[in-house]
Design a protein with these regions (language model features):
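Non-catalytic pre-domain segments flanking phosphatase-related domains
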Residues: 1-5
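Active-site-proximal, substrate-binding regions of enzyme catalytic domains
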Residues: 7-135, 141-145
Length: 145
């Protein structure tokens, strides 16, 4: 059975629980909605473990962008593990993608809430990538429903 390439959409709570989650999806691509970046930015203040993890995710993303160079990020950034982080054997790696288009969740979900913005970005991602499985990774049971 061949495994097709998938796109994993990471929710804020996954990254605030484990900042290395970015690098744990092998050859598959990872997508981070704009709302997740905003929630990480809001969550980085403080001394709690989740605040430290939010800051670490930001450092990982910054390092990836800097190593990517000045070329266009719209095609994705190769998910090369940072130095000192040994999570998997060498092999094919996916790319990190960011939400580049604004969605209008009010048209689909009514209220403009963070979860609705994330769901709107997932639906847009599915429309933009027909035939590619898109998987939400979240600890939020209601969001997964």
């Amino acid at each position: 059975m061949t495994r097709s390439k998938r796109i994993y959409v990471l929710d804020t709570n996954i990254l605030m629980h484990d900042p290395t989650a970015l690098f744990k999806f092998e050859e598959h691509d990872v997508f981070i909605p704009m709302m997740v970046l905003e929630e990480l930015d809001n969550g980085k203040k403080g001394h709690s473990e989740s605040s430290r993890n939010a800051r670490q995710v930001s450092r990982f993303i910054n390092e990836l962008i800097e190593s990517h160079g000045s070329s266009d990020i719209s095609e994705g950034i190769t998910l090369i593990q940072p130095k000192g982080l040994n999570l998997r054997a060498a092999g094919t790696v996916g790319k990190l993608h960011f939400q580049l288009k604004q969605t209008e969740p009010g048209k689909r979900f009514g209220s403009v809430l963070p979860d609705n913005l994330i769901l709107g970005s997932i639906l847009q991602l599915k429309e933009d990538n027909p035939g590619v499985p898109v998987v939400l990774v979240s600890k939020d049971i209601n969001l997964r429903i």
